[in-house]
UniProtKB/Swiss-Prot annotation:
Signal peptide: none annotated. It comes from the Bacteria. One of its GO terms (cellular component) is cytosol. This is Leucine--tRNA ligase. Belongs to the class-I aminoacyl-tRNA synthetase family. It comes from Pseudomonas fluorescens (strain ATCC BAA-477 / NRRL B-23932 / Pf-5).
Length: 868
């Protein structure tokens, strides 16, 4: 055994062993308990960042621990390889996205391997490869034929210069991020998944996920947004509108119907179009609304604006004429593109009515009283007793809901209904680097799915996009084809799928990644699924996790999987944060400096008082800790850390610095501390092994001192087992091992029994650290004379008898103050403990002249003597 800890050699040897032995390749083993551990697969952006390292280390610790529990563990890895960053990089570097992506995958794979992950690389999937997306297209055609996927017009952000559709995040202050052109809203045909058909089940089956964080489930519940309300119809005022009809609105507050003072419609609503015919001002306003963002979040924060029309509708219960306004806060794709405005009890309506001097009529008695003067108060939105509502006065919310529904039903102008905030999932993207949508457009036959035998529709990989629209739409060699039904010349769909589609089913493909008979081999899928432990960032709480749950139900209904949910347990790991440093330039901009380029200045108490740039010695500002990001230049390159300290040190620091679900603050001194600890473990083991391995430990003949050491060993096993196995508190498990090391380093090594005890201690350290620092544990296990690899060893068994103490140290208090300690046999009775405490020298001193009123004995811990 080498005298010094040499992580590079140790880690290379361990990884070579695992590769040669195919240690982590698994197959279905009927009868053996399975465990499927999965971390969200990475986007191949170029190189790993510390967030990746943390995510994959957490998954690896759990996987290795479960293997030590005797389970057949699957931990696969792949690449979420389609997406816009590849197109942007391609335009910047004039290189095909495919080439850029595959080069990044190759580099990042070597980085992941250097971490020593227990990954079954034989199951690797890459979502931009035809052998993967072929099955996505196969499922698409089946769902299209069933009507679960359909085509309709959708509103998008259109860049008139680049002639392309932009995602909401590519629209900056109403302009295209690349061209700077003013963005228009356009209606274009798009494909949609009918996720709303599963809304009830997606909501209800959240209750079947006790292993998910409550926060994530709440976010999904809110996103699905089930609400019971009323569909109310306002008859057209025929004198102003010129025809009969009704304006439909949905409201969750029908109790406030008598307080409606106007109605507002979206810019795209037919009444807005009608009103604008001879109104240039309204036409200009509608065009402005259509140029705004289509994102709901932007709508909520933007200034409320509107224009009146000359149109009116009638109140369904009073017949009163209400003016129709066009407003920018009404969304065409929510409800029916119209709202009944009750300014007294809705904040948006209040803001709008106050701005345009519209009537505000209070109809609910709230904790703020019977009036609703400006400014808006949250109390105005409360439920309460109805006022100013005619026959409905005095009713509470449930009573008013029912009574108003009866009144509306009599007039055939309304009824209660359940509505969801969730909208069908539009998956068409006018982009190149994505999975082609397998549809052919025929003038005679309409939209025809590509037949199964013609799949996959392969995306050409030698294309360099230029940012002006989809390259596929300019490639006749791609889109010209024959109709599969009638044989006539037809046109292939040139849109590609949202990249969230690929990540919605990848976890299932890992069960049978090379299966040629379908999307999954049902037998393999049902063997491994659902995933036992899924790990990823909370930022995926809604979209990815909701879409994956939806896809799982689609696959179930296609007979591909038998379970209802994809992920049994979910761990959302915290961010990796680090200090930021900057200088503010003369023009007001910020220049950010990497922590590695900054030197800290400290006072005599080691408190940081300033910082300066190493290169010029001039001061920089300390910006506080933030998430590691390119924009703040506060990232630490994992590769340089691994090269300097080794993967085990990085893994140990990551797991020790904080619990996995909390933010982790990067600390160079913390990394150095982790490295020092591993050197201590190595040093103790090396000194022990160099003297030759001892014989077996004879537990029956241990001295009291030796029993205390063995108790420390088994106490560490007990605590670490709870921390790792039940709570994923890897940081406290590591602390237990550190405490044990303190004991072992001080343990005597004079006798054969002493050395046999140290052998048990070192074996325990190796086993407890094996999931966290697998390379050094692999080496130590062999050096300690153990046969077989540590990855095939079981988690250390707890010997409960080792925890039993012959004698106990008890604290003595007089009137609650510490006055001494006594050592008592563990078997001592309460009376014996009390007698020993009363006769203790210190107790006698502090109770002299006092009467002992009461003696409280807390078994195994303390004695408190109350005297006065």
């Amino acid at each position: 055994m080498h005298e010094h800890y040499q992580p590079r050699e140790i880690e290379a040897a361990a990884q070579l062993f695992w590769d040669e032995q195919k240690s982590f390749e698994v197959s279905e083993q009927p009868g053996k308990e399975t465990y499927y551990c999965l971390s969200m697969f990475p986007y191949p952006s170029g190189k790993l960042h510390m967030g990746h390292v943390r995510n994959y280390t957490i998954g690896d610790v759990i996987s290795r621990y479960q293997r030590m529990q005797g389970k057949n563990v699957l931990q696969p890895m792949g690449w979420d390889a389609f997406g816009m960053p590849a197109e942007n990089a391609a335009m910047k570097n004039n290189v095909a996205p495919a080439k850029w992506t595959y080069e990044n995958i190759a580099y990042m794979k070597t980085q992941l391997r250097s971490l020593g992950l227990a990954v079954d690389w034989s199951r690797e999937v890459t979502t931009c490869k035809p052998d993967y997306y072929r099955w996505e297209q196969w499922l698409f055609t089946r769902l299209f034929e069933k009507g679960v996927i359909y085509r309709k017009n959708g509103t998008v952000n259109w860049d008139p210069i680049d002639q392309t559709v932009l995602a909401n995040e590519q629209v900056i202050d109403g302009r295209g991020w690349r061209s700077g052109a003013l963005i228009e809203k356009r209606e274009i045909p798009m494909y949609y998944f009918k996720i709303t058909a599963y809304a009830d089940e997606l909501l209800e089956s959240l209750d079947e996920l006790p292993g998910w964080p409550e926060q994530v489930k709440t976010m999904q519940r809110n996103w699905i947004g089930k609400s019971r309300g009323m569909e109310v119809q306002f008859p057209y005022d025929q004198a102003s509108i010129g025809e009969a009809g009704t304006l439909k609105v949905f409201t969750t507050r029908p109790d406030t119907l008598m307080g409606a003072t106007y109605v507002a419609v979206a810019a795209e609503h037919p009444l807005a179009t009608l009103a604008a015919q001879d109104n240039p001002e309204l036409q200009a306003f509608i065009a402005e609304c259509k140029g705004g963002s289509v994102a709901e979040a932007d709508m909520a924060t933007q200034e409320k604006k509107g224009l009146p029309t000359s149109l009116f509708v009638e109140h369904p219960l009073t017949g009163e004429k209400l003016p129709v306004w066009v407003a920018n806060y009404v969304l065409m794709h929510y409800g029916d593109g119209a709202v009944m405005a009750v300014p007294a009890h809705d904040e948006r309506d209040f803001e709008f009515a106050t701005k345009y001097n519209l009537p505000i009529k209070a109809v609910v008695r709230t904790s703020a009283g019977d009036e609703t003067p400006a400014p808006w108060q949250d109390a105005y939105g409360e439920h309460g007793e109805l006022i100013n509502s005619g026959e409905f006065n005095g009713l509470d919310f449930p009573g008013a809901f029912d009574a108003i529904e009866v009144a509306l039903l009599k007039k055939n102008l309304g009824q209660s209904r359940t509505q969801f905030r969730l909208r069908d999932w539009g998956i068409s993207r006018q982009r190149y680097w994505g999975c082609p949508i397998p549809i052919i457009h025929c003038d005679s036959c309409g939209d025809v799915p590509v037949p199964q035998e013609q799949l996959p529709v392969v995306l050409p990989e030698d294309v360099v996009p230029d940012g002006a629209g989809s390259p596929l739409a300019r490639m006749p060699e791609f889109y010209e084809c024959s109709c599969p039904k009638c044989g006539a010349p037809a046109k292939r769909e040139t849109d590609t799928m949202d990249t969230f589609v690929e990540s919605s089913w990848y976890y299932a493909r890992y069960a049978s990644p090379h299966y040629e008979g379908g999307l999954v081999d049902p037998a393999a899928a049902n063997h491994w699924l659902p995933v036992d432990q899924y790990i990823g960032g909370i930022e995926h709480a809604i979209l990815h996790l909701l879409y994956a749950r939806f896809f799982h139900k689609l696959m179930r209904d296609e007979g591909l999987v038998s379970s209802n949910e994809p992920f049994k347990n979910l761990l959302t790991q915290g961010m990796v944060i680090a200090e930021t440093y900057y200088r503010r330039e003369a023009n007001g901009s910020y220049t950010w400096y990497n922590p590695a380029d900054v030197e800290l200045e400290r006072d005599s108490k080691a408190k940081i008082i300033g910082a300066k740039l190493i290169s010029d010695g001039l001061p920089v500002e300390i910006g506080g800790t933030e998430k590691m990001a390119k924009s703040k230049n506060n990232g630490v390159d994992p590769q340089s850390m691994i090269e300097q300290y080794g993967a085990d040190t990085c893994r140990l620091f990551m797991m020790f610095a904080s619990p996995p679900d909390m933010s982790l603050e990067w600390s160079d001194s913390g990394v150095e501390g982790a490295h020092r600890f591993l050197k201590r473990v190595w040093r103790l083991a090396q000194a022990h092994v160099s003297q030759g391995l001892p014989g077996a430990l004879d537990i029956a003949t241990l001295s009291d001192e030796q029993k205390a050491i063995r108790r420390a060993i088994h106490l560490a096993i007990k605590q670490a087992s709870q921390d790792v196995g039940q709570h994923h508190k890897f940081n406290t498990a590591i602390a237990q091992v550190m405490t044990l090391m303190n004991v072992l380093e001080k343990a005597p090594q004079g006798s054969e029994q002493d050395r046999a005890l140290l052998q048990e201690g070192l074996q325990t350290v190796a086993l407890l650290l094996a999931p966290i620092t697998p390379h050094i544990s692999h080496e130590l296990w062999g050096q300690l004379g153990q046969s077989g690899a540590i990855i095939d060893a079981g988690w250390p068994a707890l010997d409960e008898s080792a925890l039993v103490q012959d004698s106990l140290q008890l604290v003595i208090q007089v009137n609650g103050k510490l006055r001494g300690q006594i050592e008592m046999p563990a078997s001592a009775s309460r009376e014996e403990v009390e007698a020993a405490a009363r006769s203790n020298e210190n107790v006698l001193r502090f109770t002299e002249g006092l009467t002992i009123r009461k003696v409280i004995v807390v078994p195994g811990k303390l004695v408190n003597i109350v005297a006065s």
